[in-house]
Amino acid sequence: MNSFKIKSYAKINLALNVTGKKSKLHNIESLISFIDLHDSITITESNTKQHKINFIGRFSKNISKINTISKLLKILDNKKLLNNKKFEIKVIKHIPQKAGMGGGSMNAASLLNFFIEKKLIKIKKNDSKKISNEIGSDVILGIKPSLAILLSNGDIKKFKNKIKFHILVAKPNFGCSTKYIYSKVDSFSKPQFNPPKQKLFEAKYLKNLDNDLEKVALNKYPELKRIKSYLNGLPNTLFVRMSGSGSSIVAYFHSKKACKKACSQYKRKFNNHWCIESKTI
């Protein structure tokens, strides 16, 4: 059987505003980019009666048997879209869990993209949106991933042009509970990103934006406050922002050299934290 290898890229929120709450869910708007940090997924058609999913790698511990990939496969089976074909999926996890980088969501999105591109399933654009939303709110962002603005009404505006930032991604040895962080949000921002324009991704604009979830996360976890303060104090840092609901903190640079130097300084200061250099793609 042929095996296919695909990359499942991490996403980061360059800015995030919580603009309100409707029933149990919060309305957010966000500036989103993908970065070259990725999980590696191998897909093999199988003769077995059940799909097999195997997570390996540094960040593969404690992933539930009911995960984004198993949910996707179950939906596709229930809709009889896979024509009774079964697959063995192996995921090497390089993206940390509970980091605000959508690792699990992007795994499901990457797999759905693969099935569509290889014509293993035939669905309309609207169906891929419905399937994505059944799995998780972030999944839709990974369907044909690109620079994007998520608007508070749920619409997504995508851009073909790329932005060029070198980034340091740091994460302490704990994750943040998305549910907890959102539950403590007690004030809302006015929408800022409508109409959506590419110029919002320029450093001069980004510097003055925020992630509304930082206030809650940094109060709950003083270590995140320490990380952000330290990164802000490094030379050539353009701005520093938490991604999603944390716990990853991202520092942005124009040059690879400055980013590399910052990363080595960070590792000396916080030697038990995870820290990598990456770039927007």
Swiss-Prot record:
<keyword id="KW-0808">Transferase</keyword>
<dbReference type="Pfam" id="PF00288">
    <property type="entry name" value="GHMP_kinases_N"/>
</dbReference>
<keyword id="KW-0547">Nucleotide-binding</keyword>
<feature type="active site">
    <location>
        <position position="138"/>
    </location>
</feature>
<dbReference type="InterPro" id="IPR014721">
    <property type="entry name" value="Ribsml_uS5_D2-typ_fold_subgr"/>
</dbReference>
<dbReference type="InterPro" id="IPR006204">
    <property type="entry name" value="GHMP_kinase_N_dom"/>
</dbReference>
<feature type="active site">
    <location>
        <position position="11"/>
    </location>
</feature>
<keyword id="KW-0067">ATP-binding</keyword>
<dbReference type="GO" id="GO:0019288">
    <property type="term" value="P:isopentenyl diphosphate biosynthetic process, methylerythritol 4-phosphate pathway"/>
</dbReference>
<comment type="pathway">
    <text>Isoprenoid biosynthesis; isopentenyl diphosphate biosynthesis via DXP pathway; isopentenyl diphosphate from 1-deoxy-D-xylulose 5-phosphate: step 3/6.</text>
</comment>
<dbReference type="InterPro" id="IPR036554">
    <property type="entry name" value="GHMP_kinase_C_sf"/>
</dbReference>
<protein>
    <recommendedName>
        <fullName>4-diphosphocytidyl-2-C-methyl-D-erythritol kinase</fullName>
        <ecNumber>2.7.1.148</ecNumber>
    </recommendedName>
</protein>
<dbReference type="GO" id="GO:0016114">
    <property type="term" value="P:terpenoid biosynthetic process"/>
</dbReference>
<comment type="function">
    <text>Catalyzes the phosphorylation of the position 2 hydroxy group of 4-diphosphocytidyl-2C-methyl-D-erythritol.</text>
</comment>
<keyword id="KW-0414">Isoprene biosynthesis</keyword>
<dbReference type="InterPro" id="IPR020568">
    <property type="entry name" value="Ribosomal_Su5_D2-typ_SF"/>
</dbReference>
<comment type="similarity">
    <text>Belongs to the GHMP kinase family. IspE subfamily.</text>
</comment>
<dbReference type="InterPro" id="IPR013750">
    <property type="entry name" value="GHMP_kinase_C_dom"/>
</dbReference>
<dbReference type="GO" id="GO:0005524">
    <property type="term" value="F:ATP binding"/>
</dbReference>
<dbReference type="Pfam" id="PF08544">
    <property type="entry name" value="GHMP_kinases_C"/>
</dbReference>
<keyword id="KW-0418">Kinase</keyword>
<dbReference type="GO" id="GO:0050515">
    <property type="term" value="F:4-(cytidine 5'-diphospho)-2-C-methyl-D-erythritol kinase activity"/>
</dbReference>
<dbReference type="InterPro" id="IPR004424">
    <property type="entry name" value="IspE"/>
</dbReference>
